[in-house]
Amino acid sequence: MGASQSTNGPGQKTTSVEELSKRLAYRFANKCFTPLELTHLKDNFFSRALDQGGIRYWNEEILSEFLGIPDGAGSAAYVTSDGSLDAGPVIFRMVSYLGAFPFQNTMAPSVLTFEAMVKVIVLLTERYGKVLKRGRKDRVKLLFGSLADVGRRDIVVQLQEAAEDSLELIGEAGPGSDRTFTHPTGFSVDKPAHDDDGEEDDDDLALAALESLDAIEIFKHDQRIDKTVYESKISINTFRRLLALLMVTAPLRPLGTISKYTTGLSSSILETVNEQVESILAALALDDLEGGIGYKSFSELISTSLPYLFDPLTPLFEHLLFSKNLDVTRKRHSQSQNDPAAKPVPTPPSTPPSSPPLSPVILNGGFDSSILNPTLLSHLSFFLSTTAQIPNIFRNRTRLHPVFSSTEHGESLTSFSHHVMTWQAPSILLIKGVVTSESDEEQITTIGAYLPQPWKQSSSNSSRRSSDVPDQSTLPCLFELSPVHTVLQGSPSLSSLKPNMPVTYFSTKTGIAIGCQIPPPSRKSLGADFLPKPSGGGSLLIDPALEVATLVISDGLNGEGVFLPPGISAHSASKSVSCTTLAASTASISASNHNTTKSISIYSLEVWGIIPSQSLSAQLDSPGSFVEKQDAITQQRAQWDFEAREAERRKVINMKVGVGELEEHSGRALLEMAGIVGDSQYSGLRHLR
């Protein structure tokens, strides 16, 4: 790219950044793809590639059309009127940056050649682990750089310049001499700068790539590896368009039809998508909404409350590894018909195996939800983990079973107990209601909690992990989905909390409490001193009538508790040596990061049971174990049948001491007072530790 090369003597070996970039692409191709996948990728790429001066490449229109992404510039321009899904330019900007890896400062934006496409697919599908042994945490920084568009030169101009100069060498090097490089400025987002925050932020991913090529010195000339501050930012419009695309494609499976999620969207679906997108944007600081999203805010948002946000990009770009033009099975079948004497030879599948039929994530039966919808489920998939092996609820085939609905089953703790206390599996609690502000304006809000343990009384902590950093799927989670995205992760020291700090607490007198401190029982009259008290980073209280919910979000000043303050992850909290250190290190990206109490008038309260996939459950069984796990739905129905039989049996108990109707009613009254029959059989205190 406008750089000259020189040699200092016989046998001197010239090394350029472009050559190293190609070497890394070849290594990625050989190590991260199967021969079959590589064949399909080549067919997809070269059958559509443009040619300019001997360079085969893809432009934005080709990429958007192949991926099925709405793009106002090409034939895939089936974008809606509001343009919310017009994400083609955003995706193309991302791949143009990632294609230059690990020399973004020198080569970005790159022409989307075959080598660049190989690196893009490996990075976005996280297949680089087969070549690079470290650097997973640096992926967030890489994604930020690919999205940053504030403070850069026009992307189109740079792409044109890159295409014209793509055959020129960028640098020169020789053994025993200093390596010097002259190259274009590149993106300002990659310029080295001093880090005033004192935060260690090594480019582990890029460093690992150069280590694999024995080219560390060249990397040091390309960019600093010790500390980097990104001066550029992501514009709100760019991030909004990307969020809308990720929201609608979250359920996408490998080899699934992309257009099913990106086209033909109704106005009501677009409205719910935009509501959830704006909720996530509202979690950013006001300064970010004006001048763009800085790296620090972006990194904190992703790492603490949206760890699986970019998961939909994996199946999206895996589409490049399957070509509809290739059908080896059909060719071999025709050959066998021409040669009947040929022996049948077992052959591998000609195409990547298609995904098994996927059961609906939301199971039918019970009731129609007035809260949960596909868009809300996509929002949940960005941060909710139900298994350690495959965290994403769409990838691990998690199913949600309707357990309780206040709209369907009534606003009664008796009904809640009957449906929820008999559910012996993890669950999700969702509440939709209205908050009245000081100006008497009503605002719809949706909150919830992920509870990995069943709602039952248990004095055993054996189900909790005792590791320093517990698996996220075993920790509870308190969250707000709208109007401001807020996530309060479970404390890694959950098992060491006092017995009066259960995850959930159920009482017919005080209602439902999640993440609260429970006062000791007393015979005195019920008062404020005997109500559950908020603790830790957040708590949720629901009155016995299921009419009012109180959400308390704290900055950590309430001491230890079940939940961490917003903006703190379980991993970072495990490194804190004390509650004081944890509170001092709290730096939330959420607008709710201060002591706030929201009183919510409940419109609807729902509980959804979590059912893991049968194949995943089998993998979690210990080796050699043939014990079948009874389905949670079957268990609940068996419990209901048992209770029905017991109730029927108790009806025939003859408590009459004389004759007449009065004695019969007196006998039944005694049974109800004892809690054997009637609604009172569900009374009492039940809690979960």
Curated annotation (Swiss-Prot):
Coiled coil: none annotated. Residues 343-359 have a biased composition (Pro residues). GO terms for cellular component: cytoplasm. Residues 173-201, 332-359 are annotated as: Disordered. The keyword Cytoplasm applies. Belongs to the RTC5 family. This is Restriction of telomere capping protein 5. It comes from Paracoccidioides brasiliensis (strain Pb03).
